[in-house]
Amino acid sequence: MNELFLKIINMSISASWLILAVLILRLVLKKAPKWVNVLLWGIVAVRLICPLSFESALSLIPSSETIPLDIEMAAKPTIDSGVPAINSVVNPVLSSFAPPQHVLTSANPLQIWIPILNIIWLIGVGALLLYTAVSYWRLCRKVDTAVRYKGNIFQSENVSSPFVLGIIKPRIYLPFNMNGQDLEHVVAHEQAHIRRKDHWWKPLGFLLLTIHWFNPLMWLAYVLLCRDIELACDEKVIKELGNEQRADYMQALVACSVNRRMIAACPLAFGEVGVKERVKSVMNYKKPAFWVIIIAVIICVGVAACFLTNPKQDRYTLRIVVPAGSQEEFVYTEEEVSTVRNSIKIWSGDGLGDTEVLLFPVNKTAETGYTATYLTHGMSVEFDAENDTWFKIGVNMQNPTNEDIIVYVEVENV
């Protein structure tokens, strides 16, 4: 469970770089259709959902794994954010958590703190899920006496503002006191939401927010997603109704802007938000030029290429677990590597001092192994290696403590 928690933190950090890019692009693409903003938030969702990503030279994500999944077991815990300024601030703090070298049996405090943070995260997730369930139940009770107006449109005396409720079979709920002209425009707006599948995207956004609730940028992204969805829907309705009905549509928006607290509080209901901004957007709406749409789409494709991929690595960090109570012997990496340049270059990584290092071909006997070479911290050792052969890296270590020790080697040309 701790590894899952750290994986989610890493995914959230990677998505944060994308969120920052989207915040900037929302300002740059003011003249673009609002659905472009929604598409950009969709790219953020993909980054948050997919645990795996391809490597690309185009990637603008500084680091694919900021926090090592085994950081709590590391002799010297460090992060790799891909930004030296951040590393220089955070890593000295993390190093202070490491037990002194002369206290061999002391546990890494991160082994205590990470499970505690994991529990806090789970409590937060549970609280938001409970909040969603309770608010949805309260809203369902509020409309259980609603009367069918026509089709999937219902009216209720307990409703003061229109909204869409439901994911599989969405229903439109309206107050009884709406006049005919406002009702026509409001129904057009809510039906546009359903056609655009917005009643799917808002719950999905809130689900991702529930998982990544610890990230402040996720809260900002969710608020802006809801606003951008409304603005995109308004543009769609104005395009269908025509400019001559723009003033009447704005009047309907204003009429729906009161007493909507109950709707806004339910993540599974789709009510009207940001009415002032929406009225201003409707007043200033102009059909975007074709070239603006083309540029916006190209930018979205570029954003996906740069932020849905991980940075291409030319050096990898491999983990070696030194068992508790072990005598001096060679211990090997869990991962296997294969050369791409007829040689493998090795550096001493975190927790590993000067020692012997060995390149060992997998599925071969010990007699076919390479000769051990002394590895000095800060300097590299290079082994000639056959192509199409997989190797493990071994280091000569001992561990007299009662806890497993994790050390790292860095390899290149693999």
Give residue ranges: language-model regions.
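Active-site scaffold of zinc-dependent metalloenzymes
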Residues: 158-181
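Short helix/loop segments within enzyme catalytic domains
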Residues: 195-196, 220-277
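Edge beta-strands of jelly-roll/beta-sandwich modules across compartments, strongly enriched
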Residues: 353-357, 401-413
